């Protein structure tokens, strides 16, 4: 008997779409425009990276609390684009781009000996990334930058002074209040004790006269899941500044001088 042979004219499932996309993918001559945007690994883990127009890479990891949200590691690396080679460093991997299209990116992790090709899908930029961009690109006023040294501390409860002291370097009791702050352009705030030991290296954002401080950028984005402090610049000159915080019936105020 004769078994008729029919020419294969289509592929099952979304195979035709995949073949069509592969035919249109670039495998060399990459430009920055080819890879900008948010790319998420096609494994349902919600892990991906965002590349801006300047080639800065930000890592995003999906977390689950009361709701789904993304942690952001802002500008953790820069794309290496050299001729026909494109390498994207993200979360410990060095992704060497094999091919890129309008909605798909294929890459091999140079840090993994298996040389397995991984698929990334282009998706809408998560809100967390856009908010992180807004925070980190907001200019820090020049008058706030640099180091500030505590010289006075007050604490009031129900409007009455409980503590009202000058900060003296030689007073052991006062050392609990003494610290130096440093604000930097990259929205980092560092804190030292009076002996010069660094206590904290945190992140901050500005909104009007309010400074909100958290352990890192992700905690700034989601204060309900983490501890944050918000201080108000209640008075400011070129070389002095007061930071005030109100909590319930308690008001704290630190007076600083420029160091």
Features from the language model and the residues they span:
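Short beta-strand edge segments in extracellular beta-sheet folds
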Residues: 121-123
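Extracellular glycan-recognition regions
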Residues: 10
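Hydrophobic residues positioned within well-ordered beta-strands of beta-sheet architectures
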Residues: 3-4, 20, 37, 118, ...
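Contiguous, well-ordered beta-strand patches that form the walls/edges
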Residues: 1, 42-50, 56-116, 154-156, ...
